[in-house]
Every structure is written in structure tokens, then in C-alpha cells.
Amino acid sequence: MELKKQAQKGTIISEKFIEPENYRVILLNDDFTPMDFVVAVLISIFNKSQEEAETLMFKVHKTGQASVGIYVYDIATTKCFQVLTAAKNNNFPLQCKVEKV
């Protein structure tokens, strides 16, 4: 994205804005975390609807993983940390990872 400004003496100044890179948060399947907990995580951390959360949970269960959102780096890593913390606090081995898009 580029913005152009005109300085006081007629000089045009060009400012370029670099778009931040996007990162995908991926939820990983395991054999111990209850499906209801995964749905609750998707609703509370990723703001998914009940229907979206259930669809994603089944995708994780059937394929081993699913992308649950794309965010800038800081938000992606924060959400992944929130998932890991919630899982640990509830004694579940649920894992997630962050990958550059």
C-alpha cells in the first residue's frame, strides 16, 4: 500500500506501508482430549460459532489437524498459547502450532 503526501513546498513524499505477514493457527488431534473441550476452545479462543466449532473439531479428529484461523504473528502466537494453557489447566494434551501462510 502506498500513500502520497504533498509537502509544503510542492515536493511529493511517498510513504510505503508494509502489510504484516499472516500466520495460520493449526489445531492437532490427539486421542485423549474430549471433543467437547475442543469445541469449547474453538468457541472461546477463536470466536467460532457452535456449528463452525463442531465442523472444525471433526476435521481435526478425522484428518489429524485443521487450520482454525489466520492472524498476524502476535495474535496467532497468543491464541496458540491460550490453547496450550487451557489444555494444560484441564490436564489435556491438546496441541496447536503456528505456520507462516
Swiss-Prot record:
Q: Name one GO biological process term.
A: protein catabolic process
Under InterPro entries, the record lists: ClpS, ClpS_core, Ribosomal_bL12_C/ClpS-like
List the transmembrane segments: none
User: What is the annotated quaternary arrangement, including any partners?
Assistant: Binds to the N-terminal domain of the chaperone ClpA.
Task: Write out the similarity annotation.
Answer: Belongs to the ClpS family.
Say what the protein does.
Involved in the modulation of the specificity of the ClpAP-mediated ATP-dependent protein degradation.
Name of the featured protein? ATP-dependent Clp protease adapter protein ClpS
